[in-house]
């Protein structure tokens, strides 16, 4: 049986990951964590842990490493963008645990709206015109500002 540790299971993405894995035919044991005990995935996981917030990076990482060791985790699946950044930066500390995240190049592009727009444009994917705050933007509406 493979042991999978999923972070941020209380959010929509975490819930989707947990629910999809539960529906699979894989022999897995799911351990989940979230900053809130009462959440949409609490009853779906085999074990639940209340986690510190990722904003306290060292505290959050110590919590993750502790669970990885004590619960003999095979796979770590960080869900939120900030948690993915932390795990990507420190994944060598996990030794033999497999981390379920994209490769560093994909993360660099996908986690930056400007780089994503440039990448898609170069690839020929139709995208809305993108302006950076240092440029003069459109003078007509409607428009989306992010």
Predicted feature residues:
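ATP-binding N-terminal substructure of ATP-dependent carboxylate-amine bond-forming enzymes
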Residues: 1-101
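Short, glycine/charge-rich beta-strand/loop segments that flank catalytic centers
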Residues: 77-87, 102-109, 131-138
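Active-site nucleotide/adenylate-binding loops and adjacent lid/helix of ATP-dependent enzymes
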Residues: 107-146
């Amino acid at each position: 049986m493979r042991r999978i540790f999923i972070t941020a299971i209380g959010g929509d993405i975490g819930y989707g990951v947990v629910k999809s894995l539960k529906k699979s035919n894989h022999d897995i044991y799911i351990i989940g964590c979230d900053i809130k005990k009462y959440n949409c995935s609490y009853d779906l996981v085999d074990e639940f842990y209340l986690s510190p917030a990722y904003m306290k990076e060292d505290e959050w990482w110590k919590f993750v490493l502790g669970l990885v060791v004590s619960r003999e985790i095979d796979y770590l699946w960080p869900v939120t963008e900030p948690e993915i950044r932390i795990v990507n930066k420190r994944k060598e500390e996990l030794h033999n645990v497999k981390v379920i995240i994209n490769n560093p190049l994909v993360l660099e592009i996908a986690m930056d709206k400007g780089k994503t727009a440039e990448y898609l444009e170069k690839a020929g994917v139709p995208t809305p015109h993108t302006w950076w705050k240092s440029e003069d933007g459109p003078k007509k509406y409607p428009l989306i500002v992010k």
